[in-house]
Amino acid sequence: MSVKTPSLFGGAMIIAGTVIGAGMLANPTATSGVWFTGSLIVLLYTWFSMLSSGLMILEVNTHYPHGASFDTMVKDLLGPAWNVINGVAVAFVLYLLTYAYIFVGGDLTAKGIGSAVGGEISLTVGQLVFFGILAFCVWASARLVDRFTSILIGGMVLTFIWATGGLIADAKMPVLFDTQAPAGTSYWMYAATALPVCLASFGFHGNVSSLLKYFKGDAPKVAKSLWVGTLIALVIYILWQIAIQGNLPRNEFAPVIAAEGQVSVLIETLSKFAQTGNMDKVLTLFSYMAIATSFLGVTLGLFDYIADIFKWNDSISGRTKTAALTFLPPLISCLLFPTGFVTAIGYVGLAATIWTGIIPAMLLYRSRHKFGVGKNYKVYGGFWLMVWVFLFGIINIAAQILSQMELVPVFKG
């Protein structure tokens, strides 16, 4: 009896679900300095670079057994010192994101249940319900994550169209391209603050090894999943830029920037220039589904990374041990310190750049020297692509450090 192989669609949905988070709603604000044309260039540059680095990880991964993740590859090719650096960066990012998703998703769950039953539900109950359902999916199998994510992505697309269809149709070209701006208006001086935000919008690298295992070593199919999943995200991001930056003039962004991109303030300001209707409620639903899909994608990558470190197998006991180490630390931290991630979240982008930009280029360079090209997949571009991705990582690290130190211009509206 033949075993049905996972679908390309399912793999693409896992990637799209991981990449598209509720944070994308703040992208038009974060890129308001470079405005639409600049944000389009930055998004395309970041998408290509992040996709390429993910495909580099995929090629390297083909030389190792199914289930091997960063720990095995970095230790073998770059040595123990780099493995510690990479391991700390991976764990920091994935655990902290899981923590944040439990906190925000739990809050939305508590409000949703409270509204449905006509009473008040505690944040803790909301967090446990949100966490319990999604963590079970990851513990059970990647196929269940695939199925659940596909449903949620469908809901996200519908709510996105519902919320933005009219705004996209009504986008005004003079506003979108800022044609009324005074002569000599600067845009590119704000690129350094836009880059880290766009990088965070294309993070899926923890899922490459998971997908290769899920697709039973079919690397070309994984590569197509990465292409399709990230392209879906790119199209949604560009449409969201058009919806907002095509209706809300650049010089009117001051209150939104002051509120750090808060969606309610964005919609309130936007309503002065366009019909927004019940956009706030629809975007809340979109955000909830985006947080859920991101939780599934991020924790699936963390789950397989931990299983690789400890060499735990796919038996019930092995997956239970892996699940305990994947989910209990962020859950307990979230319940005990519900706002503790605020300080650390600012450093997620910096840590993510290490293992999504710097490490993949180094891994492929060493892998090509040790093994030659991948067993059944070779990423395009050769040596110059490695240089491109490595420099992309360096540029983003520099941009984030300079932004943290407030040494680059910040657009105020």
Regions found by a protein language model. Give the residues of each.
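Loop-to-transmembrane helix boundary motifs in multi-pass membrane proteins
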Residues: V3, S7-L8, E120-V129, D218, ...
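Extracellular loop-to-transmembrane helix junctions
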Residues: P28-E59, F411-G413
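Hydrophobic alpha-helical segments of multi-pass membrane transport proteins
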Residues: V157-G166, M289-G301, L325-P329, V348-G374
